[in-house]
Amino acid sequence: MAKRRPKKPMLKFPKRMQKKMIVMFTVVAALMIGLIGRLMYIEYTSGEKYEKIVLAQQGYDSQTIPYQRGDIVDAKGTVLATSIAVYNVILDCSVLNDDEKYVEPTINALVSCFPDLTSEQLYSYLKDSPDSRYIVLAKRLSYDTIQPFVNLQEERDEKGKLVNPYIKGVWFEKEYQRQYPYGKLASSVIGFTTSGNLGINGLENYYDDTLNGINGRQYGYIDGDDNLQRTTEAAVDGYNVYSTIDATIQGIVEKYLKKYNDENKDSTREGNGAQDAACIVMDVHSGEVLAMASYPTFDLNDTRNPEALIGSKLIDVSGNSTDTVINEEIAASMKQEENNDLLVQNLNALWKNYCINSTYEPGSTMKPFVAAMGLEDGRLKGDESFECTGIIEIGGYKIRCHNYTNGAEGWLSIGESIERSCNVTLIRMAQVIGIDEFLKYMSEYNFGLKTNIDLAGEARTASLVFNSSTMGPTELATSSFGQGFNVTMIQMITGFCSLINGGYYYEPHM
Protein backbone atom coordinates (compact mmCIF):
# COMPACT_ATOMS: atom_id res chain seq x y z
CA MET A 1 0.00 0.00 0.00
CA ALA A 2 1.42 3.26 -1.13
CA LYS A 3 2.17 5.85 1.38
CA ARG A 4 0.27 9.09 1.20
CA ARG A 5 2.36 12.09 0.53
CA PRO A 6 2.35 14.51 3.34
CA LYS A 7 0.52 17.74 2.56
CA LYS A 8 2.68 20.75 1.96
CA PRO A 9 2.22 23.31 4.61
CA MET A 10 0.31 26.39 3.39
CA LEU A 11 2.52 29.30 2.55
CA LYS A 12 1.79 32.06 4.89
CA PHE A 13 2.87 35.62 4.04
CA PRO A 14 3.93 37.86 6.81
CA LYS A 15 1.43 40.57 7.62
CA ARG A 16 3.79 43.20 6.27
CA MET A 17 3.98 41.42 2.90
CA GLN A 18 0.20 40.96 2.82
CA LYS A 19 -0.29 44.67 3.25
CA LYS A 20 2.13 45.39 0.39
CA MET A 21 0.31 42.97 -1.94
CA ILE A 22 -3.07 44.50 -1.08
CA VAL A 23 -1.70 47.95 -1.89
CA MET A 24 -0.20 46.67 -5.16
CA PHE A 25 -3.44 45.01 -6.30
CA THR A 26 -5.40 48.11 -5.33
CA VAL A 27 -3.09 50.31 -7.44
CA VAL A 28 -3.28 47.94 -10.44
CA ALA A 29 -7.07 47.79 -10.18
CA ALA A 30 -7.25 51.58 -9.98
CA LEU A 31 -5.04 51.91 -13.07
CA MET A 32 -7.18 49.41 -14.98
CA ILE A 33 -10.35 51.27 -14.03
CA GLY A 34 -8.72 54.56 -15.08
CA LEU A 35 -7.58 53.09 -18.40
CA ILE A 36 -11.02 51.64 -19.15
CA GLY A 37 -12.58 54.97 -18.25
CA ARG A 38 -10.18 56.82 -20.51
CA LEU A 39 -10.92 54.47 -23.41
CA MET A 40 -14.65 54.94 -22.88
CA TYR A 41 -14.15 58.73 -22.83
CA ILE A 42 -12.12 58.64 -26.07
CA GLU A 43 -14.72 56.41 -27.69
CA TYR A 44 -17.48 58.80 -26.64
CA THR A 45 -15.73 62.05 -27.59
CA SER A 46 -13.35 61.09 -30.42
CA GLY A 47 -14.36 57.65 -31.54
CA GLU A 48 -15.66 58.89 -34.87
CA LYS A 49 -12.42 60.78 -35.51
CA TYR A 50 -10.23 57.71 -35.02
CA GLU A 51 -12.65 55.51 -36.89
CA LYS A 52 -12.31 57.79 -39.89
CA ILE A 53 -8.53 57.67 -39.67
CA VAL A 54 -8.60 53.87 -39.65
CA LEU A 55 -11.04 53.77 -42.54
CA ALA A 56 -8.89 56.20 -44.49
CA GLN A 57 -5.84 54.04 -43.91
CA GLN A 58 -7.72 50.97 -44.99
CA GLY A 59 -9.31 52.28 -48.17
CA TYR A 60 -7.91 55.65 -49.21
CA ASP A 61 -4.53 57.19 -49.81
CA SER A 62 -3.83 60.71 -48.64
CA GLN A 63 -3.21 63.37 -51.25
CA THR A 64 -0.45 65.97 -51.02
CA ILE A 65 -1.41 69.63 -51.31
CA PRO A 66 1.66 71.44 -52.68
CA TYR A 67 2.84 74.70 -51.21
CA GLN A 68 3.62 77.68 -53.42
CA ARG A 69 7.27 78.72 -53.43
CA GLY A 70 7.76 82.38 -52.60
CA ASP A 71 8.44 85.05 -55.21
CA ILE A 72 11.70 86.91 -55.77
CA VAL A 73 11.06 90.58 -56.46
CA ASP A 74 13.25 93.58 -57.19
CA ALA A 75 13.61 96.72 -55.07
CA LYS A 76 10.51 98.27 -56.64
CA GLY A 77 8.29 95.20 -56.44
CA THR A 78 8.84 93.86 -59.96
CA VAL A 79 8.45 90.07 -59.86
CA LEU A 80 11.63 88.38 -61.08
CA ALA A 81 10.72 84.81 -60.14
CA THR A 82 7.35 83.30 -59.30
CA SER A 83 5.52 79.97 -59.17
CA ILE A 84 2.43 79.36 -61.28
CA ALA A 85 -0.15 76.63 -60.77
CA VAL A 86 -0.04 73.78 -63.29
CA TYR A 87 -1.98 70.53 -63.38
CA ASN A 88 -1.28 66.87 -64.06
CA VAL A 89 -4.15 64.88 -65.57
CA ILE A 90 -4.66 61.72 -63.49
CA LEU A 91 -6.68 58.67 -64.53
CA ASP A 92 -8.24 56.38 -61.89
CA CYS A 93 -8.77 53.11 -63.77
CA SER A 94 -10.48 51.43 -60.83
CA VAL A 95 -13.37 53.92 -60.96
CA LEU A 96 -13.98 53.47 -64.69
CA ASN A 97 -13.72 49.70 -64.48
CA ASP A 98 -16.19 49.70 -61.60
CA ASP A 99 -19.03 50.49 -64.02
CA GLU A 100 -18.86 50.07 -67.79
CA LYS A 101 -21.17 53.03 -68.39
CA TYR A 102 -18.37 55.38 -67.27
CA VAL A 103 -15.80 54.20 -69.81
CA GLU A 104 -16.95 55.56 -73.16
CA PRO A 105 -18.15 59.02 -71.98
CA THR A 106 -14.93 59.58 -70.04
CA ILE A 107 -12.61 58.46 -72.83
CA ASN A 108 -14.49 60.54 -75.42
CA ALA A 109 -14.24 63.60 -73.18
CA LEU A 110 -10.51 63.09 -72.62
CA VAL A 111 -9.73 62.67 -76.31
CA SER A 112 -11.78 65.70 -77.29
CA CYS A 113 -10.17 67.97 -74.68
CA PHE A 114 -6.59 66.73 -74.84
CA PRO A 115 -5.49 66.17 -78.47
CA ASP A 116 -2.30 64.33 -77.47
CA LEU A 117 -4.35 61.48 -75.97
CA THR A 118 -5.82 58.65 -78.04
CA SER A 119 -8.69 56.33 -77.23
CA GLU A 120 -6.46 53.31 -77.96
CA GLN A 121 -3.98 54.47 -75.36
CA LEU A 122 -6.68 55.03 -72.75
CA TYR A 123 -8.36 51.67 -73.35
CA SER A 124 -4.98 49.98 -72.94
CA TYR A 125 -4.55 51.62 -69.53
CA LEU A 126 -7.93 50.27 -68.42
CA LYS A 127 -7.03 46.81 -69.66
CA ASP A 128 -3.41 46.58 -68.52
CA SER A 129 -3.81 48.36 -65.18
CA PRO A 130 -7.45 47.81 -64.19
CA ASP A 131 -6.89 48.47 -60.48
CA SER A 132 -4.54 51.41 -60.82
CA ARG A 133 -5.77 54.60 -59.22
CA TYR A 134 -2.96 56.84 -60.44
CA ILE A 135 -1.91 57.04 -64.08
CA VAL A 136 -0.49 60.36 -65.28
CA LEU A 137 -1.97 61.20 -68.68
CA ALA A 138 -0.45 64.66 -69.08
CA LYS A 139 1.89 66.86 -67.05
CA ARG A 140 2.09 70.51 -66.12
CA LEU A 141 -0.84 71.89 -68.06
CA SER A 142 -2.16 75.38 -67.50
CA TYR A 143 -5.65 75.86 -66.12
CA ASP A 144 -6.76 77.24 -69.49
CA THR A 145 -5.77 73.90 -71.03
CA ILE A 146 -7.73 71.75 -68.58
CA GLN A 147 -10.72 74.10 -68.30
CA PRO A 148 -12.74 72.58 -71.20
CA PHE A 149 -12.65 69.18 -69.47
CA VAL A 150 -13.49 70.72 -66.09
CA ASN A 151 -16.46 72.45 -67.72
CA LEU A 152 -17.69 69.11 -69.09
CA GLN A 153 -17.38 67.54 -65.64
CA GLU A 154 -19.21 70.35 -63.87
CA GLU A 155 -21.78 71.40 -66.47
CA ARG A 156 -25.34 71.41 -65.11
CA ASP A 157 -28.76 71.86 -66.64
CA GLU A 158 -31.50 74.27 -65.56
CA LYS A 159 -32.53 71.94 -62.75
CA GLY A 160 -29.01 71.76 -61.40
CA LYS A 161 -28.36 68.20 -62.53
CA LEU A 162 -25.05 67.19 -64.07
CA VAL A 163 -25.20 67.11 -67.86
CA ASN A 164 -22.38 64.55 -68.07
CA PRO A 165 -22.80 62.40 -64.94
CA TYR A 166 -20.85 59.48 -66.40
CA ILE A 167 -17.55 61.32 -66.82
CA LYS A 168 -15.72 59.75 -63.91
CA GLY A 169 -12.29 58.68 -62.73
CA VAL A 170 -10.35 61.74 -63.88
CA TRP A 171 -8.90 64.31 -61.52
CA PHE A 172 -6.30 67.04 -61.68
CA GLU A 173 -3.23 67.04 -59.49
CA LYS A 174 -2.12 70.58 -58.75
CA GLU A 175 1.52 71.54 -58.49
CA TYR A 176 3.61 74.64 -59.08
CA GLN A 177 6.09 75.42 -61.82
CA ARG A 178 8.78 78.07 -61.46
CA GLN A 179 8.53 80.88 -63.98
CA TYR A 180 10.83 83.81 -64.70
CA PRO A 181 8.90 86.66 -66.37
CA TYR A 182 12.02 88.38 -67.73
CA GLY A 183 13.84 85.30 -69.02
CA LYS A 184 17.54 86.18 -69.14
CA LEU A 185 17.41 89.21 -66.84
CA ALA A 186 19.73 88.78 -63.82
CA SER A 187 19.98 85.06 -64.55
CA SER A 188 23.23 84.48 -62.67
CA VAL A 189 21.90 86.45 -59.68
CA ILE A 190 18.44 84.91 -59.44
CA GLY A 191 19.44 81.30 -60.12
CA PHE A 192 16.80 78.66 -60.84
CA THR A 193 15.19 75.55 -59.39
CA THR A 194 15.10 71.87 -60.25
CA SER A 195 12.32 69.39 -59.51
CA GLY A 196 11.34 69.32 -55.87
CA ASN A 197 11.83 73.09 -55.48
CA LEU A 198 15.58 72.77 -55.00
CA GLY A 199 17.28 76.11 -55.59
CA ILE A 200 20.31 76.06 -57.88
CA ASN A 201 22.71 79.03 -57.69
CA GLY A 202 21.92 82.65 -56.89
CA LEU A 203 19.13 83.83 -54.63
CA GLU A 204 17.10 80.68 -55.37
CA ASN A 205 19.82 78.65 -53.67
CA TYR A 206 20.86 81.02 -50.88
CA TYR A 207 17.29 81.66 -49.73
CA ASP A 208 16.01 78.16 -50.52
CA ASP A 209 14.67 77.53 -47.01
CA THR A 210 12.96 80.93 -46.92
CA LEU A 211 11.31 80.51 -50.32
CA ASN A 212 10.14 76.97 -49.68
CA GLY A 213 7.04 76.19 -47.64
CA ILE A 214 5.45 73.05 -46.19
CA ASN A 215 3.16 70.75 -48.14
CA GLY A 216 -0.36 70.21 -46.87
CA ARG A 217 -2.33 66.97 -47.06
CA GLN A 218 -5.88 65.87 -47.77
CA TYR A 219 -7.22 62.69 -46.20
CA GLY A 220 -10.23 60.69 -47.32
CA TYR A 221 -12.48 58.63 -45.05
CA ILE A 222 -15.83 56.84 -45.06
CA ASP A 223 -18.58 58.29 -42.89
CA GLY A 224 -21.40 56.37 -41.21
CA ASP A 225 -23.50 56.48 -44.40
CA ASP A 226 -20.67 55.04 -46.51
CA ASN A 227 -20.02 58.44 -48.10
CA LEU A 228 -16.52 59.61 -48.89
CA GLN A 229 -15.55 62.59 -46.76
CA ARG A 230 -12.32 64.58 -46.72
CA THR A 231 -10.32 66.46 -44.13
CA THR A 232 -7.58 68.88 -45.10
CA GLU A 233 -4.36 70.15 -43.59
CA ALA A 234 -3.61 73.34 -45.54
CA ALA A 235 -0.23 73.91 -47.15
CA VAL A 236 2.03 76.65 -45.80
CA ASP A 237 3.38 78.74 -48.67
CA GLY A 238 6.96 80.01 -48.77
CA TYR A 239 7.98 83.57 -48.00
CA ASN A 240 8.79 86.13 -50.69
CA VAL A 241 12.33 87.47 -51.02
CA TYR A 242 12.67 91.20 -51.66
CA SER A 243 16.02 91.87 -53.32
CA THR A 244 17.97 95.09 -53.72
CA ILE A 245 18.23 94.57 -57.48
CA ASP A 246 16.66 97.33 -59.59
CA ALA A 247 15.32 95.66 -62.73
CA THR A 248 15.66 98.89 -64.73
CA ILE A 249 19.34 99.38 -63.85
CA GLN A 250 19.95 95.65 -64.32
CA GLY A 251 18.43 95.82 -67.80
CA ILE A 252 20.61 98.78 -68.81
CA VAL A 253 23.78 97.04 -67.60
CA GLU A 254 22.95 93.84 -69.47
CA LYS A 255 22.05 95.79 -72.61
CA TYR A 256 25.51 97.35 -72.85
CA LEU A 257 27.38 94.18 -71.91
CA LYS A 258 25.61 92.44 -74.79
CA LYS A 259 26.23 95.39 -77.11
CA TYR A 260 29.97 95.27 -76.40
CA ASN A 261 30.13 91.54 -77.05
CA ASP A 262 28.08 91.77 -80.23
CA GLU A 263 30.25 94.59 -81.60
CA ASN A 264 33.48 92.74 -80.85
CA LYS A 265 32.38 89.22 -81.74
CA ASP A 266 35.03 87.40 -83.83
CA SER A 267 37.01 90.67 -84.08
CA THR A 268 40.39 89.73 -82.60
CA ARG A 269 39.64 86.05 -82.15
CA GLU A 270 36.83 83.62 -82.79
CA GLY A 271 33.92 83.75 -80.38
CA ASN A 272 32.45 86.27 -77.97
CA GLY A 273 33.90 89.77 -77.72
CA ALA A 274 35.20 88.87 -74.25
CA GLN A 275 35.63 85.49 -72.64
CA ASP A 276 34.06 86.98 -69.51
CA ALA A 277 32.42 90.37 -69.05
CA ALA A 278 30.69 91.51 -65.88
CA CYS A 279 29.47 94.59 -64.03
CA ILE A 280 28.26 95.47 -60.53
CA VAL A 281 26.37 98.59 -59.49
CA MET A 282 26.32 99.22 -55.72
CA ASP A 283 24.94 101.88 -53.39
CA VAL A 284 28.10 103.20 -51.68
CA HIS A 285 26.21 104.21 -48.53
CA SER A 286 24.55 100.87 -47.80
CA GLY A 287 26.26 98.03 -49.67
CA GLU A 288 23.03 97.28 -51.54
CA VAL A 289 23.67 95.71 -54.94
CA LEU A 290 21.50 97.49 -57.51
CA ALA A 291 22.70 95.46 -60.49
CA MET A 292 25.00 92.50 -61.02
CA ALA A 293 25.45 91.01 -64.46
CA SER A 294 27.70 88.55 -66.26
CA TYR A 295 28.04 87.80 -69.96
CA PRO A 296 27.32 85.39 -71.59
CA THR A 297 23.92 84.86 -70.00
CA PHE A 298 21.12 82.28 -70.28
CA ASP A 299 17.33 81.99 -70.18
CA LEU A 300 16.07 81.00 -66.74
CA ASN A 301 13.02 79.36 -68.36
CA ASP A 302 15.26 77.18 -70.57
CA THR A 303 18.42 76.63 -68.55
CA ARG A 304 19.65 73.53 -70.40
CA ASN A 305 19.55 74.99 -73.90
CA PRO A 306 23.05 74.48 -75.41
CA GLU A 307 22.49 77.33 -77.87
CA ALA A 308 23.33 79.72 -75.02
CA LEU A 309 26.87 78.30 -75.13
CA ILE A 310 27.58 79.40 -78.72
CA GLY A 311 30.61 81.69 -78.81
CA SER A 312 32.10 80.42 -75.53
CA LYS A 313 35.18 78.26 -75.23
CA LEU A 314 34.46 74.54 -75.00
CA ILE A 315 35.11 72.83 -71.68
CA ASP A 316 35.92 69.13 -71.95
CA VAL A 317 34.30 66.39 -69.84
CA SER A 318 37.13 66.68 -67.29
CA GLY A 319 36.34 70.34 -66.71
CA ASN A 320 39.34 71.75 -68.58
CA SER A 321 38.98 74.75 -70.88
CA THR A 322 40.00 74.18 -74.50
CA ASP A 323 40.79 76.51 -77.41
CA THR A 324 37.75 75.25 -79.33
CA VAL A 325 34.92 77.76 -79.62
CA ILE A 326 31.41 76.32 -79.43
CA ASN A 327 29.50 76.82 -82.68
CA GLU A 328 26.01 75.80 -83.82
CA GLU A 329 27.16 72.31 -84.80
CA ILE A 330 28.85 71.59 -81.47
CA ALA A 331 25.87 73.00 -79.57
CA ALA A 332 23.48 70.77 -81.52
CA SER A 333 25.61 67.68 -80.78
CA MET A 334 25.36 68.37 -77.05
CA LYS A 335 21.63 67.62 -77.20
CA GLN A 336 22.44 63.96 -77.83
CA GLU A 337 22.26 61.75 -74.76
CA GLU A 338 25.81 60.43 -75.12
CA ASN A 339 27.13 64.00 -74.80
CA ASN A 340 25.22 64.78 -71.60
CA ASP A 341 28.38 64.95 -69.45
CA LEU A 342 29.90 67.43 -71.88
CA LEU A 343 26.74 69.54 -71.82
CA VAL A 344 26.66 69.57 -68.01
CA GLN A 345 30.29 70.71 -67.75
CA ASN A 346 29.69 73.63 -70.10
CA LEU A 347 26.36 74.59 -68.57
CA ASN A 348 27.92 74.66 -65.10
CA ALA A 349 30.44 77.20 -66.42
CA LEU A 350 27.66 79.24 -68.03
CA TRP A 351 25.54 79.27 -64.87
CA LYS A 352 28.38 80.68 -62.72
CA ASN A 353 28.20 84.25 -61.48
CA TYR A 354 31.53 85.75 -62.54
CA CYS A 355 31.11 88.66 -60.11
CA ILE A 356 31.45 86.38 -57.08
CA ASN A 357 32.62 82.98 -58.34
CA SER A 358 35.74 83.97 -60.28
CA THR A 359 38.98 85.73 -59.35
CA TYR A 360 41.39 87.91 -61.31
CA GLU A 361 44.32 90.28 -60.83
CA PRO A 362 42.85 93.71 -60.12
CA GLY A 363 45.53 95.63 -62.02
CA SER A 364 45.48 99.41 -61.89
CA THR A 365 42.14 99.48 -60.05
CA MET A 366 44.30 98.75 -56.99
CA LYS A 367 46.12 102.10 -57.19
CA PRO A 368 43.51 104.24 -55.36
CA PHE A 369 43.66 101.77 -52.46
CA VAL A 370 47.43 102.26 -52.17
CA ALA A 371 47.09 106.04 -52.01
CA ALA A 372 44.33 105.70 -49.40
CA MET A 373 46.53 103.38 -47.29
CA GLY A 374 49.28 105.96 -47.07
CA LEU A 375 46.96 108.88 -46.39
CA GLU A 376 45.00 106.99 -43.72
CA ASP A 377 48.18 105.80 -42.01
CA GLY A 378 49.74 109.26 -42.12
CA ARG A 379 52.86 108.16 -43.96
CA LEU A 380 51.62 110.19 -46.90
CA LYS A 381 50.59 113.76 -46.23
CA GLY A 382 48.88 114.42 -49.55
CA ASP A 383 51.22 117.10 -50.86
CA GLU A 384 54.07 114.78 -51.89
CA SER A 385 55.39 114.32 -55.40
CA PHE A 386 57.04 111.16 -56.67
CA GLU A 387 59.36 110.87 -59.64
CA CYS A 388 58.63 108.55 -62.54
CA THR A 389 61.91 107.62 -64.18
CA GLY A 390 60.16 105.34 -66.66
CA ILE A 391 61.72 102.25 -65.15
CA ILE A 392 62.59 101.09 -61.65
CA GLU A 393 64.62 98.09 -60.51
CA ILE A 394 63.32 96.07 -57.56
CA GLY A 395 64.97 92.87 -56.36
CA GLY A 396 66.79 92.42 -59.63
CA TYR A 397 63.64 92.96 -61.73
CA LYS A 398 63.13 95.97 -63.97
CA ILE A 399 59.58 97.27 -63.74
CA ARG A 400 58.47 99.75 -66.36
CA CYS A 401 55.85 102.43 -66.39
CA HIS A 402 53.10 101.77 -68.92
CA ASN A 403 54.15 105.01 -70.64
CA TYR A 404 57.79 103.90 -70.84
CA THR A 405 57.96 104.02 -74.64
CA ASN A 406 56.99 107.71 -74.59
CA GLY A 407 59.53 108.60 -71.92
CA ALA A 408 59.25 109.05 -68.18
CA GLU A 409 56.30 110.86 -66.61
CA GLY A 410 58.56 112.98 -64.41
CA TRP A 411 57.39 114.30 -61.05
CA LEU A 412 53.77 113.51 -60.21
CA SER A 413 51.54 114.31 -57.27
CA ILE A 414 49.51 111.55 -55.63
CA GLY A 415 46.45 112.54 -57.64
CA GLU A 416 48.40 112.75 -60.91
CA SER A 417 49.97 109.35 -60.24
CA ILE A 418 46.53 107.76 -60.08
CA GLU A 419 45.18 109.86 -62.94
CA ARG A 420 48.01 108.77 -65.25
CA SER A 421 48.13 105.27 -63.73
CA CYS A 422 51.89 105.41 -63.25
CA ASN A 423 53.38 102.15 -61.98
CA VAL A 424 56.69 103.67 -60.91
CA THR A 425 55.26 106.37 -58.65
CA LEU A 426 52.82 103.88 -57.09
CA ILE A 427 55.76 101.63 -56.28
CA ARG A 428 57.46 104.54 -54.56
CA MET A 429 54.31 105.19 -52.50
CA ALA A 430 54.16 101.51 -51.48
CA GLN A 431 57.80 101.67 -50.38
CA VAL A 432 56.95 104.60 -48.11
CA ILE A 433 53.99 102.68 -46.65
CA GLY A 434 56.05 99.52 -46.04
CA ILE A 435 55.17 95.81 -46.10
CA ASP A 436 53.60 95.55 -42.64
CA GLU A 437 51.23 98.49 -43.11
CA PHE A 438 50.43 97.45 -46.67
CA LEU A 439 49.36 93.97 -45.53
CA LYS A 440 47.38 95.43 -42.63
CA TYR A 441 45.30 97.56 -44.97
CA MET A 442 44.89 94.73 -47.46
CA SER A 443 43.10 92.90 -44.65
CA GLU A 444 41.15 96.04 -43.70
CA TYR A 445 39.83 96.21 -47.25
CA ASN A 446 38.84 92.53 -46.95
CA PHE A 447 41.18 91.26 -49.66
CA GLY A 448 41.74 87.55 -49.04
CA LEU A 449 38.50 87.30 -47.05
CA LYS A 450 34.93 86.59 -48.10
CA THR A 451 32.52 89.51 -48.17
CA ASN A 452 29.71 87.15 -47.06
CA ILE A 453 27.35 88.48 -49.70
CA ASP A 454 24.04 86.59 -49.64
CA LEU A 455 24.71 84.61 -52.81
CA ALA A 456 25.91 81.03 -53.09
CA GLY A 457 29.41 80.18 -54.25
CA GLU A 458 31.54 83.18 -53.29
CA ALA A 459 35.14 82.31 -54.17
CA ARG A 460 37.79 81.91 -51.48
CA THR A 461 40.86 84.11 -52.02
CA ALA A 462 42.84 83.54 -48.80
CA SER A 463 45.53 81.61 -50.68
CA LEU A 464 45.57 84.10 -53.56
CA VAL A 465 46.95 87.11 -51.66
CA PHE A 466 50.33 87.75 -50.08
CA ASN A 467 51.06 87.47 -46.38
CA SER A 468 54.01 88.37 -44.17
CA SER A 469 55.94 85.26 -45.17
CA THR A 470 55.36 85.60 -48.92
CA MET A 471 55.62 89.36 -49.49
CA GLY A 472 59.03 90.85 -50.13
CA PRO A 473 60.14 94.07 -51.84
CA THR A 474 59.28 92.75 -55.30
CA GLU A 475 55.82 91.52 -54.26
CA LEU A 476 55.17 94.85 -52.54
CA ALA A 477 56.08 96.64 -55.76
CA THR A 478 53.86 94.54 -58.03
CA SER A 479 50.98 94.62 -55.55
CA SER A 480 50.97 98.42 -55.69
CA PHE A 481 49.64 98.22 -59.24
CA GLY A 482 47.45 95.18 -58.69
CA GLN A 483 49.53 92.28 -59.94
CA GLY A 484 50.60 89.07 -58.21
CA PHE A 485 47.41 88.55 -56.20
CA ASN A 486 43.76 87.84 -56.99
CA VAL A 487 40.44 89.33 -55.94
CA THR A 488 36.76 88.92 -56.77
CA MET A 489 34.68 91.68 -58.31
CA ILE A 490 32.50 91.86 -55.23
CA GLN A 491 35.59 92.40 -53.05
CA MET A 492 36.79 95.23 -55.28
CA ILE A 493 33.55 97.17 -55.50
CA THR A 494 32.83 96.80 -51.78
CA GLY A 495 36.29 98.09 -50.97
CA PHE A 496 35.91 100.94 -53.45
CA CYS A 497 32.68 102.01 -51.75
CA SER A 498 34.61 102.45 -48.51
CA LEU A 499 37.05 104.76 -50.33
CA ILE A 500 34.15 106.88 -51.58
CA ASN A 501 31.80 107.00 -48.59
CA GLY A 502 34.25 108.23 -45.97
CA GLY A 503 35.76 104.94 -44.89
CA TYR A 504 32.71 102.85 -43.96
CA TYR A 505 32.85 99.21 -45.03
CA TYR A 506 29.33 97.84 -45.55
CA GLU A 507 28.76 94.15 -46.05
CA PRO A 508 27.38 93.76 -49.58
CA HIS A 509 23.92 92.30 -49.84
CA MET A 510 21.27 91.43 -52.39
Task: Map each language-model feature to its residues.
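Periplasmic/cell-envelope proteins involved in peptidoglycan metabolism and beta-lactam response
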Residues: 1-332, 359, 436-444
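Beta-lactam-recognizing serine transpeptidase/beta-lactamase-like catalytic domain environment
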Residues: 5-8, 79-82, 87, 222-234, ...
